[in-house]
Amino acid sequence: MKKTGYFLLAVIVIVAAAGVGYWKFSGNPDALREIVLEQCLPDQLQHQNPAPCAEVKPRAGYVVFKDRHGPLQYLLMPTYRINGTESPLLLEPATPNFFWLAWQARGYMSKKYGHDIPDSAVSLAINSRLGRSQDHLHIHISCIRPDVREQLDNDLTRISTRWLPLPGDLMGHEYLARRVTESELAQRSPFMMLAEEVPEARDHMGRYALAVVRQSDGSFVLLATERNLLTFNRASAEEIQDHSCAILSSR
């Protein structure tokens, strides 16, 4: 009986993985890279016009792009080839701190909205290798889900300065959480914090998704989840975001 149960579980996992694979590759996984390298960057360099991006910073190595999903969602992407969280380049000291740059770009949301958006309503997220649809590194700059905001507010005093399991999980998935100051976030990439501080993470970075959220006391919470097909977790940190920005209508 036990063998039958394990077999059925294995079949379910294989089918789930196959479904994820189809979902991921049924479109063009290089679409964002083509926009950055073939449109935004050449237009900026040749015509000083970032279109179709909102901003292009060749020397700093990044662009900001308005995503088509959601009225206020933007993406921060590198101006050169980095696939995603699995890239060794993210652990190089010379690589830009893309999460900090993404946080600095949150003003585009307010500009698009027409009003100031409080930092507490903003979140940053990057999905794992299996949890993404595009093979060009992109950090989602968007609103946080109201229920996630409430949970993190309630857990404020229980989140440590070390990576520890977040009490109660998030969205039904296990997350690690770590509190950092604004200065720490500005000086050190969350990718490096995860790789250097979580056992075995460095060798399996592509399995992880990361998110960053501002807390009411001015600190930031780093969130990390590792893919686990047995629990149907593709490690898509974007799940904590709400691209419709319902949190703004409740304020």
Curated annotation (Swiss-Prot):
EC annotation from Swiss-Prot or TrEMBL: 3.6.1.26
The protein, known as: CDP-diacylglycerol pyrophosphatase
Any GO molecular function: CDP-diacylglycerol diphosphatase activity
Organism of provenance: Salmonella paratyphi A (strain AKU_12601)
Subcellular location: Cell inner membrane
Native organism taxonomy: Bacteria, Pseudomonadati, Pseudomonadota, Gammaproteobacteria, Enterobacterales
Enzymatic class: hydrolase
Primary localization class, coarse: membrane
Catalytic activity line of the entry: a CDP-1,2-diacyl-sn-glycerol + H2O = a 1,2-diacyl-sn-glycero-3-phosphate + CMP + 2 H(+)
Sorted UniProt keywords: Cell inner membrane, Cell membrane, Hydrolase, Lipid biosynthesis, Lipid metabolism, Membrane, Phospholipid biosynthesis, Phospholipid metabolism, Transmembrane, Transmembrane helix
Domain of life: Bacteria
Gene Ontology biological process terms in this record: CDP-diacylglycerol catabolic process; phospholipid biosynthetic process
Pathway this chain belongs to: Phospholipid metabolism; CDP-diacylglycerol degradation; phosphatidate from CDP-diacylglycerol: step 1/1
InterPro entries xrefs: CDP-diacylglyc_Pase, CDP-diacylglyc_Pase_proteobac, HIT-like_sf
Transmembrane segments: 5-25
Membrane topology: Single-pass membrane protein
Cellular component, GO, one term: plasma membrane
Family: Belongs to the Cdh family.
